[in-house]
Design a protein with these regions (language model features):
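Short, Lys/Arg-enriched segments at the junction into DNA-binding effector domains
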Residues: 2, 110-168
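A general structural signal marking secondary-structure boundaries and capping sites
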Residues: 70, 119-123, 165, 182, ...
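Solvent-exposed beta-strand sheet faces enriched in polar/charged residues
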Residues: 30, 128-130, 135, 142, ...
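N-terminal/domain-start alpha-helical segments
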Residues: 1-122
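Positively charged, aromatic-enriched patches within helix-turn-helix-type DNA-binding elements
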Residues: 140, 145-205, 210-212, 218
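Short amphipathic alpha-helical/adjacent loop interface patches that line ligand
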Residues: 24, 109-112, 136, 178, ...
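A short, glycine- and basic residue-enriched loop/turn
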Residues: 9, 42, 60, 81-83, ...
Length: 220
């Protein structure tokens, strides 16, 4: 999953980027509203974390422009202003959720999971497929009730394929949700992650369509 983080506070932004990356998200971090609009136009994101008080263009202006273009990207707004009017303005401008600073990283992560779950149409917090259970909150995977050790990027690949069962995802689509724009990408990184997942969860779990991509088929 790829997140656009828009936060001008250096200390907070760095902490959020590191924390979210450790949770398995690919994070692009920008520090002003103009840059946010450029990144929104150039990349595909699953969620945006947007501070209200930004230089060059405010978070509310960025949000209104996004919604005005018909963009349905989930947006979690951050603010230091804890008044009802501020919250109402943010939500009425199109925010999906609202978090007041200071906040706990665990709460932010839980709100992100809820927004992503809502967008994918899931009501249950865990994902089940055959004898596999994946829990995004704990980053845990079990097979036939037994824990399976999964590396963070393997987990991210598995989550993306499970949330898109029946849909073929190209290597480029998988890479886009694994890496931020600053990361160096090995040419065969996705293939390596797929290979490891097959060894751990079954050779027939992920199907390859040569020249097209990878898919986990829906259960009959």
């Amino acid at each position: 999953m790829r997140i656009l983080l828009v936060e001008d506070d250096e200390l907070l932004g760095n902490g959020l980027q590191v924390g979210l990356q450790q949770s398995g998200y690919a994070v692009d971090w920008v520090k002003d509203g103009q840059s946010a609009e450029l990144f929104l136009g150039a990349g595909a994101y699953d969620l945006m974390i947007l501070d209200i008080g930004l230089p060059k263009r405010s978070g509310l202006e960025v949000l209104r422009a996004l919604r005005g273009r018909g963009g349905d990207l989930p947006v979690l707004m951050l603010t230091a202003r804890d008044t009802v009017d501020d919250k109402v303005e943010g939500l009425d401008s199109g925010a999906d959720d609202y978090l007041v600073k200071p906040f706990d990283l665990d709460e932010l992560a839980a709100r992100i999971r809820a927004l992503l779950r809502r967008r994918s149409g899931r009501s249950e917090p865990v994902i089940r497929h055959r004898d596999i259970v994946l829990d995004p909150a704990s980053h845990a995977v079990t097979r036939a009730g037994r824990p399976v050790e999964i590396a963070p990027r393997e987990f991210a690949v598995l989550l993306q394929l499970l949330e898109n069962r029946g849909r073929v995802l190209s290597r480029a689509q998988l890479e886009q949700n694994l890496y931020s724009w600053k990361d160096e990408i090995d040419s065969n990184a996705v293939e390596v992650h797929i290979h490891h997942l097959r060894k751990k969860l079954g050779a027939d779990l992920i199907r390859t369509l040569r020249g097209v991509g990878y898919v986990i088929d829906k259960e009959a």
